Amino acid sequence: MRVSLFLQKQIIECSKAFQPHSTRLQWPKSQDKVFVAMSGGVDSSFSAYLLKSQGYNVEGVFMRNWLDEDSAPSGCPAERDWATVQKVCKKLNISCRRFNFEKEYWNLVFEPSLDLYENGLTPNPDVSCNRQVKFGALFDALKKHCENNVKGDWWLASGHYAKSVVNIETNESHMCIPTDKRKDQTLFLCTIRKEALEKTIFPLHNWTKENVKKQASSAGFKEIAEKQESQGLCFVSPNVGRKFRKFLQRYLNFSDRPIKVIAGKNVVGEFSGNHGIWSLTVGERCGLSLPQAQSEYFGRWYVWKKDIKNNALYICRGTNNELLMSKCIYLKDWKWCGTKLQNLEKSALSCFVRVRHQQPLQPAKVTWRNPESVKIHFQDKQRAVTPGQVIAVYVNDVCLGGGMVDTVEPEKDFD
C-alpha cells in the first residue's frame, strides 16, 4: 500500500526522534519527591534503596488489590508483603503508606478478565492491572495527595524493567526497552496512560536482574533477594496449573453440554462441561487421550481454535502445524504509550512487534485501520497468536503502544 508523502516525512521524523542522541533519561531533580511502588519483592525494594542512596526524598507506597486472602490463588499474600515493605522502609529510614484498591481491581481488571475468559479469550490481566490500577488508581491518588501536600515536582518510581526517556526537542515522554532485554517488561506496560508515563521513572532501566539480586544482598536485603519471585493474580495465566483453574471455577459459568473435540471435520472425543472451554488456550496440548495405535490419531495434538457458541474445541497434530501459524492478525482497543502518530489510517508502517513476554521483537508491517483498530502483517510466521492477548508495537527500542488480539488469520484452513 502506498504511503503518503506526509506520513513518510512523519515516520522519518518519528524515527529520528527515537534515536538515543535525541532523547535524555527521564529522571527527577534532586529536590523532587519520589514515591516508590513497593510489593515486598527485590526489584521494588532495590529501586527504593537506589533512590534513597542517591539522596532523593523517597516514600514507599503499597497497594492491596485483593480483598479475600483465602480465595486468592497462591501468589502474593498481601499482609505478609505489606509487613516486608514496612520492614524495608524502616531499614531505609523512609516513610511508607498503604492504598486499598480492591474495588478498582475487581471492577477494572478482574471482572473484565472473567468476561474475556467466558467468551473463549485468554486475557492479559497484568497489562490491564498496570493501566487501570498501578498507573491508574494509584497514580491518581498520588496526584491528588501531592496537590495539597507536596511542594514542587513529584514522581512515581516502579521496579519494572523498562526505561522512560524525554525527547529533547518536543519534551514528550517515551517508554523504551531496558538494558536487560531478557527481563524487558515493556509489553506489560504498553498501554499505560500518557499522563502517568510523563511522571514515571524506572530505576532498574540499566540494571540486569542478576546484578540487582547481587547488589541487593550486599546492601542488606539478602533474604528478599533470595526468596522465590512471587506472582500476584495479575501475572497468572491458565497455563500455570490446576490451582489457578480451580480458583477461576468459582467465578465462571459452565455449560451443561460436553465440549466437542474436533480434528479436521471429525468429532474425536469430548470433555465434560465442567472442564471449562475457557481453561484451554490456543497453542497448548490437548489433554484428550487419543488412540495412538491408530495412524490417524498418532502424535501430539494441540488446540488451534475454540468455538464458544457451539462448545467445540478444534485440535491439530504437531506443535508447528500450519493451523497454529499466522502472518496476519488484527488488534482492537489500541492504546498509545507516549507519542501518538497522526494520520496513520490505511498506511503501513514498518515496526517491530512483541507477541509474548521474552519473545524477540518480530519485524512486521503495521496498519492503523482506525484509531483503535490495527492490522499487523508479520515478516515471519508466528505460532499460536491468541485472541485476548495484548501485543506491543515498537519503533527502534521505543514502545508505541499496544492492543488486544481480536482475530487471527491462519496460514491454512481445512477444506
Curated annotation (Swiss-Prot):
It is found in: Mitochondrion. InterPro entries: MnmA-like, MnmA-like_C, MnmA-like_central, MnmA-like_central_sf, Rossmann-like_a/b/a_fold. Signal peptide: none annotated. One of its GO terms (cellular component) is mitochondrion. The active site is at C129, C234. It holds the Pfam family tRNA_Me_trans_C. Disulfide bonds join C129-C234. The record marks H160, R285, Q389 as: Interaction with tRNA. This is Mitochondrial tRNA-specific 2-thiouridylase 1.
